[in-house]
Amino acid sequence: MIRNATIEDVPRMQAVINSHAELGKMLFKSYAELYEHLRDFAVFEETGEIIGCVGVAIIWADLAEVRSLAVDEKARGRGVGTKLVHWCIDEARRLGIRKLMSLTYEQRFFEKLGFEVVAKETLPLKVWSDCVKCPKNENCDEIAMVRVLPEVPPSTHLTAPPTPRGISIPVLMEMEAE
């Protein structure tokens, strides 16, 4: 069953996320990061054990990110990841967010869920704030994907501006250092 994450879930969430980070599939998460963003996360619990988790990070009024989608290796292939992404889609709808994005290596998985590949440059600069912590930031090989939720009306707020031309992830590192 999927439920909102609680303080008690953080150690297991970190273990599942960081097992994928060790393989270079996502960023490591500290306890502090998970506690700070706990309200953004859901967990998949089965027979009292957390076997997966995911977060929805709001980027802008019209865009949220599927973040830290991780499923325990023992539970892979059983639809846990799909159910967690559906939770993200439902959460975006509930919040009135029209677009959901992911930076991923699992293109086919997300395509099956209605996501489409987009140019990274079409995403707002704020998306790249985590990239300064990534060892691959200068050679990012993740695929940017977006799913538009047509049933959610367009936001009346400003939409997030795309990354300006000429700005690249290495420039973000220089900007962060200032």
Predicted regions and their residues:
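A short, acidic/glycine-rich surface segment
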Residues: M26-F28, G52-C53, K126-V132
